[in-house]
Swiss-Prot record:
Membrane topology reported for the UniProt record: Single-pass type I membrane protein
Pfam families: Hemagglutinin
Extracellular side: 17-527
GO biological process: clathrin-dependent endocytosis of virus by host cell; fusion of virus membrane with host endosome membrane; fusion of virus membrane with host plasma membrane; viral budding from plasma membrane; virion attachment to host cell
Family matches, as SUPFAM superfamilies: Influenza hemagglutinin (stalk), Viral protein domain
Localization terms from the record: Virion membrane; Host apical cell membrane
Transmembrane helix among keywords: yes
Protein name: Hemagglutinin
Gene: HA
Length: 564
């Protein structure tokens, strides 16, 4: 019986540690049942209340024709379009921001090669339009407008419509041709010209009389001289001969000279180059749709405000930067500590040191109290706004950092790529590795700052309350204060809004503190009571056992023999 009484006293005493009957006020922060894990400088897994994904992984499976102008080459690549191959007439006069080359594009005319194909392709793509200016060329005593069965247009033998195939005259003559064109305009001119390589010496003399032929094209700053390479080659569209196409840019005030004794594929004019255009080219099989997007990749369009993407390295327009990571989360809320279940017999409350509060929905920080009038919860808007102000704009600042640095690095790498083409892939891989690391580091820095800021605001709120209460309350060590005076809801509100006057309650608090401390059982007293209770219980059990044995012996129920 005594043990039961002592046990009840201990339970009551243990419960009174959580709530003594004095008012309690706790500081806490918002929490959710399931937060989001983010990475910081010091920890790979930190749970926060809210976070924003920064890496776009969703793609529109089509190319958007607005706001960027797209030109679909269909069966023609951009070089065939510039040469005027059959089937490319739809590209005459075309203008674009992005020229779409299809993997299914095919050559449809006389077989050719371009020794500096990628450079010509880049010049044409960057120019953003096919603005062809026809010119008159005076070729003497030669036959013009050569045609080929390999180049059908409407089932009739034809040729590249931007070029003029010169062969010997009907009188079997191909005299030296020397023709000069001066650029008197205010723009640069692009001339595309070619050299025919026959398959046999007989073909050479049948077409040009002279063997070998020669083509020399010069400007004030450059000269290209080509001697035809005569020889048999695999048949392509019925032809074993080939044409090599070259290109020359003539700046304003410069001139171009064509000198040949045979094999020249002459231009019919020039393309006007626009130095102000910033167009490009994209090789993809993705169809053009009716959507709107400023960003295109070889896998489709992106419509996003995220600063990074993990869809394709090839991205054109106003696009997120490509990174290797599939996910980078930016913390937009505080550290998350899910709320524990109610503790104790009397539902004791706890503050931010032990857990967050899932019921705090009007702010990030707030108060809970327990007094004679009941319990309550209220948000603290001042500390909430202070934290939000420091976090707002974090995503925009991150985008500004990445954009500024990316453009600088991009320019440096482009110069390297232009000079050392063998290093192009290595440079691209290095650029992506660098930006993937950069992005991860920037996000980790911002996440660390967010968590530090939100923790700091929580501590500021706690210190603000502690300075108000002073000796009128006791810090319980869990984010709560036990108040040693009567504190109704108005009093609690004054603590929350910073108008609490501790001098008014000082005397009452001191008296109550001493009275409570005088009657509290210390840990030593509890130990003594437990030992006394245990000893008495053991004594009673032994006494009862001995009494039972004596009673049984007297009644003959137990016989006891002692042998010596």
């Amino acid at each position: 019986m005594l043990s039961i009484v002592v046990l009840l006293l201990l339970i009551a005493e243990s419960s009174s540690q959580n709530y003594t009957g004095n008012p309690v006020i706790c500081m806490g922060h918002h929490a959710v049942a399931n937060g989001t894990m983010v990475k910081t400088l010091t920890d790979d897994q930190v749970e926060v209340v809210t976070a924003q994904e920064l890496v776009e992984s969703q793609i529109l499976p089509e190319l958007c024709p607005s706001p960027l102008r797209l030109v679909d080459g269909q069966t023609c690549d951009i070089v065939n379009g510039a040469l005027g191959s059959p089937g490319c007439d739809h590209l005459n006069g075309a203008e674009w921001d992005v020229f779409i080359e299809r993997p299914s594009a095919v050559d449809t005319c006389y077989p050719f090669d371009v020794p500096d194909y990628q450079s010509l392709r880049s010049i044409l793509a960057n120019n953003g339009k096919f603005e062809f200016i026809a010119e008159e060329f005076q070729w003497n005593t030669v036959k013009q407008n050569g045609k080929s069965g390999a180049c059908k247009r409407a089932n009739v033998n034809d040729f590249f419509n931007r070029l003029n195939w010169l062969v010997k005259s009907d009188g079997n003559a191909y005299p030296l041709q020397n023709l000069t064109k001066i650029n008197n305009g205010d723009y640069a001119r692009l001339y595309i010209w070619g050299v025919h390589h026959p398959s046999t010496d007989t073909e050479q003399t049948n077409l040009y009389k002279n063997n070998p032929g020669r083509v020399t094209v010069s400007t004030k700053t450059s000269q290209t001289s080509v001697v035809p390479n005569i020889g048999s080659r695999p048949l392509v569209r019925g032809q074993s001969g080939r044409i090599s196409f070259y290109w020359t840019i003539v700046e304003p005030g410069d001139l171009i000279v064509f000198n040949t004794i045979g094999n020249l594929i002459a231009p019919r004019g020039h393309y006007k180059l626009d130095s102000q255009k910033k167009s490009t080219i994209l090789n993809t099989a993705v169809p053009i749709g009716s959507c709107v997007s400023k960003c295109h990749t070889d896998k489709g369009s992106l419509s996003t405000t995220k600063p990074f993407q993990n869809i394709s390295r090839i991205a054109i327009g106003d696009c997120p930067k490509y990174v290797k990571q599939g996910s980078l989360k930016l913390a937009t809320g505080m550290r998350n500590i899910p709320e524990k279940a109610s503790r104790g017999l009397f539902g004791a409350i706890a503050g931010f040191i032990e857990n967050g509060w899932q019921g705090l929905i009007d702010g990030w920080y707030g108060f809970r109290h327990q007094n004679a009038e009941g319990t309550g919860t209220a948000a603290d808007l001042k500390s909430t706004q202070a934290a939000i102000d420091q976090i707002n704009g974090k995503l925009n600042r991150l985008i500004e950092k990445t954009n500024e640095k990316y453009h600088q690095i991009e320019k440096e790498f482009e110069q390297v790529e232009g000079r050392i083409q063998d290093l192009e892939k290595y440079v691209e891989d290095t650029k992506i590795d660098l930006w993937s690391y950069n992005a991860e580091l920037l996000v980790a820095l911002e996440n660390q700052h967010t968590i530090d800021v939100t923790d700091s605001e929580m501590n500021k709120l706690f210190e603000r309350v502690r300075r108000q209460l002073r000796e009128n309350a006791e810090d319980k060590g869990n984010g709560c204060f036990e108040i040693f005076h009567k504190c109704d809801n108005n009093c609690i509100e004054s603590i929350r809004n910073g108008t609490y006057d501790h001098d008014i309650y000082r005397d009452e608090a001191i008296n109550n503190r001493f009275q409570i401390q005088g009657v509290k059982l210390t840990q030593g007293y509890k130990d003594i009571i437990l030992w006394i209770s245990f000893s008495i219980s053991c004594f009673l059990l032994v006494a009862l056992l001995l009494a039972f044995i004596l009673w049984a012996c007297q009644n003959g129920n137990i016989r006891c023999q002692i042998c010596i």
